[in-house]
């Protein structure tokens, strides 16, 4: 008989809400091992008895478990020999500081197959799920993740589902959100000119939804994390009516397609992009458009010709709707700047007040907190998350060192917040406009909800340096209530820290931070920054040369003002009738501020090329400029030769290299738009190369909203790696302000409890940035 031992295994990773414990039980029984498995909230604890060789085999199986499970770390220790009669799963218990809230997981292939199989008892059941898929975060009342702690507690299991739930050999064993036609949520509808709730059969409702879409109507659909508006994406009239309804003039829509094969009719798809489309998160993936796809979708879907946002069905109902084999526009049901509608009463009110919506399809399952669709892409050979919401939120990101409990409240433009405990940072992105009271109130509620859900009471708060951000004001208010200190982190340093935290960097690095705006330590507006970072400190060693820019939120949206300010600075005349007013304002210092913004420079070049004068949505002008540059690359155009002037200024903190874009303007205007757009991108890449060469630092960080630009990111990565640099950028977190709170939290985790002060020389800072 083989010598037996007992071991305790502590397993960390994505092991909650993914059918991990039943899989562990099956594996142990196959190997004739005995013991127990228990969910501790943030990890899984296994006691296992058997031959050491079999336990080794068991461990290998754990690490190779299929997604969505992901084993990141196993701590193994021998314990006194303990005889067990069998291998069993025992009830969950909470573990101090080990709370883990699982993310929603898109419908899996096994459930899709069942849902589309005639005769299966879940055939055409829109809310099908198993241990490998289904809602989690959006239906979770409290931890640990057990059925009685979710919105599915309102749906007692029928006898058949209960047997599946108990059967350790069934893939629905301990599936906390499993249901069927007999015991789970039901598809319901409101239709114009029909009785308020039917009665209609499930098949009638599904067919009605498909028929309405085929006829070009707009329908409202309850998804996993909120309500969506849906129409067919190949009809101009339908998409234009949707734009009017949403008050969304230009911002691109994403398209839902049934399969990767359908997506390939519209876009070029690499192996990595296919994996991302089919991943458990089912995010929107930004893909390169096929030229032949133009007739297949309405031009009203997007004004961009080179890229398209596409995603596969994240849950059963969308998989059934996508069977019509027409690309569907799916967008959040809200107005621009407001959070997605997720409460039933609000959804009913929205439907009743908008007659252009032909029907509302819903169920009575309660959504406890919303989650918009995530947005991703493959860039420089890696996944880049641009919006980290459904499927990713609230899963934490592990950092290298344990630290204090921190609440970080991010910036202003792309609201986010983060909570940290031990070596984990939980980061949330809140797509909304905090200048709107409804959005600001929602943001505050969500912060409080996460604190309660994760059992985290912060020891310290961290906010942006800008004195008048809503989030900074909220930080000061909360700090007073909780009697804890507040740390302020300079905006671009926060971006740098987000990359350092994600990639476990603490040595000296050059951080290249390009974005639209951020309050600088000198009281001016920063945005085209080169920061020499080490540990948690930084020195500004370079920047786009600051010029006088007309301030105010509206001016930030007006690319033509950015252009005219640059022309005034460069001494280049303009025949624009508005130029005289701008020149006088700059000369007199009237409502102006010094700015080194790279984002505003992208806007100015876009306006100079006649691509766009106004940001009707965030980043529009820069996206159109990138689109033209991508067009030039596809058509193999020779880029216009453009350059910056370089000058060195001595300051009390050392030398600062400024890059003046003045030489750009005479060459840009009047040139081939696509060639000039590509030339501008290459000029920016060259100044990044130049600063890396000047500083001699091996490690380079790329962050800030401008690095959502794939051409810029990939160009910088390729150029820097070609010169032997180690290059890091945001991948698990967004490069823009959506990832800012993550960097702030990391700063706070490892900083003494004292307020950090910066000297600011600007007057009237509020409202000028």
Set out the residue ranges of the language-model regions.
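Internal gly/pro-rich beta-alpha loop/helix module
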Residues: 324-400, 590, 594-595
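A phosphate-binding glycine/aspartate-rich beta-alpha loop in the early core of alpha/beta enzymes
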Residues: 78, 218, 226-291
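Intrinsically disordered, low-complexity, mixed-charge
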Residues: 1-177, 181
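Conserved phosphate-binding/catalytic loops in two-lobed NTP-binding clefts
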Residues: 464, 483-495, 699, 710, ...
């Amino acid at each position: 008989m083989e010598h037996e031992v007992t071991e305790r295994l502590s397993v960390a990773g994505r092991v909650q809400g993914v059918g991990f414990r039943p899989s562990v039980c099956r594996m142990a029984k196959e190997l004739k091992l005995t013991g127990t498995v228990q969910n501790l909230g943030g990890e899984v604890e296994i006691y296992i008895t058997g031959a050491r060789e079999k336990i080794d085999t068991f461990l290998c199986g754990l690490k190779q478990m299929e997604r969505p499970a992901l084993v990141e770390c196993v701590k193994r220790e021998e314990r006194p020999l303990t005889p067990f009669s069998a291998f069993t799963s025992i009830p969950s218990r909470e573990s101090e500081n080990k709370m883990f809230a699982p993310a929603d997981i898109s419908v899996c292939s096994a459930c899709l197959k069942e849902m589309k199989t005639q005769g299966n008892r879940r055939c055409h059941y829109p809310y099908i799920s198993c241990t490998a898929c289904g809602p989690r975060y959006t239906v979770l009342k409290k931890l640990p993740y057990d059925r009685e702690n979710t919105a599915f507690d309102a749906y007692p299991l029928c006898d058949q589902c209960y047997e599946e739930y108990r059967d350790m050999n069934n893939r629905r064993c301990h599936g906390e959100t499993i249901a069927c036609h007999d015991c789970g949520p039901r598809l319901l509808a409101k239709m114009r000119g029909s009785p308020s709730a039917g009665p209609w059969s499930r098949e009638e409702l599904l067919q009605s939804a498909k028929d309405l879409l085929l006829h070009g109507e707009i329908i409202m659909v309850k998804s996993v994390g909120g309500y969506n508006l849906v129409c067919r994406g190949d009809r101009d009239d339908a998409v234009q009516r949707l734009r009017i309804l949403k008050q969304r003039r230009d911002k691109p829509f994403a398209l839902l397609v049934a399969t990767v094969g359908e997506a390939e009719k519209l876009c070029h798809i690499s192996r990595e992009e296919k994996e991302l489309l089919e991943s458990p998160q089912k995010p929107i993936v930004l893909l390169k458009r096929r030229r032949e796809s133009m007739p297949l979708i309405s031009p009203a879907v997007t004004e961009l010709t080179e890229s398209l946002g596409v995603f596969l069905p994240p849950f059963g109902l969308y998989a059934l709707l996508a069977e019509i084999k027409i690309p569907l526009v799916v967008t959040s049901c809200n107005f621009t700047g407001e959070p997605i509608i997720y409460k039933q009463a609000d959804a009913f009110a929205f439907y009743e007040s908008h007659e252009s919506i032909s029907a509302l399809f819903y169920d009575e399952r309660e959504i406890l907190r919303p989650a918009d669709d995530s947005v991703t892409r493959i860039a420089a050979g890696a996944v880049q998350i641009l919006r980290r919401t459904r499927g990713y939120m609230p899963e934490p990101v592990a950092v290298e060192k344990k630290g204090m409990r921190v609440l970080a409240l991010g910036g202003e433009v792309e609201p986010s917040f983060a909570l940290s405990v031990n070596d984990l940072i939980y980061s949330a992105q809140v797509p909304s406009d905090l200048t709107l009271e409804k959005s600001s109130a929602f943001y505050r509620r969500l912060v409080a909800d996460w604190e309660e859900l994760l059992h985290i009471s912060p020891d310290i708060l961290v906010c942006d340096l800008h004195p008048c951000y809503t989030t900074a004001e909220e930080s000061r208010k909360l700090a007073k209530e909780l009697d804890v200190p507040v740390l302020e982190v300079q905006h671009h340093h926060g971006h740098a820290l987000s990359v350092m935290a994600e990639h476990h960097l603490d040595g000296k690095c050059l951080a290249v931070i390009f974005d639209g705006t951020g309050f600088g330590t000198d009281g001016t507006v920063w945005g085209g920054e080169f920061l020499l970072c080490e540990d948690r400190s930084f020195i500004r060693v370079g920047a786009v040369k600051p010029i006088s820019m007309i301030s105010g939120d509206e001016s930030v949206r007006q690319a033509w003002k950015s252009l005219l300010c640059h022309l005034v600075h460069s001494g280049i005349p303009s025949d624009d009738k508005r130029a005289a007013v701008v020149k006088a304002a700059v000369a007199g210092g009237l409502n102006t501020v010094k700015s080194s913004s790279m984002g505003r420079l992208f806007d100015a070049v876009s306006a100079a090329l006649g691509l766009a004068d106004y940001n009707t949505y965030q980043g529009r002008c820069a996206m159109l400029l990138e689109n033209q540059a991508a067009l030039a690359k596809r058509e193999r155009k020779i880029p216009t030769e453009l350059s910056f002037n370089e000058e060195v200024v001595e300051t009390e903190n050392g030398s600062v290299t400024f890059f003046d874009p003045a030489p750009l303007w005479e060459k840009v205007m009047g040139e081939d738009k696509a060639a000039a757009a590509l030339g501008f991108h290459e000029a920016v890449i060259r100044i990044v190369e130049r600063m890396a060469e000047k500083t001699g630092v091996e490690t380079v960080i790329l962050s800030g909203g401008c690095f959502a630009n794939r051409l810029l990111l990939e160009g910088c990565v390729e150029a820097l790696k070609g010169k032997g640099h180690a290059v890091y950028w945001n991948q698990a977190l967004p490069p823009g302000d959506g990832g800012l709170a993550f960097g702030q939290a990391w700063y706070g985790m490892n900083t003494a409890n004292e307020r950090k002060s910066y000297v600011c020389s600007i007057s009237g800072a509020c409202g000028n940035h």
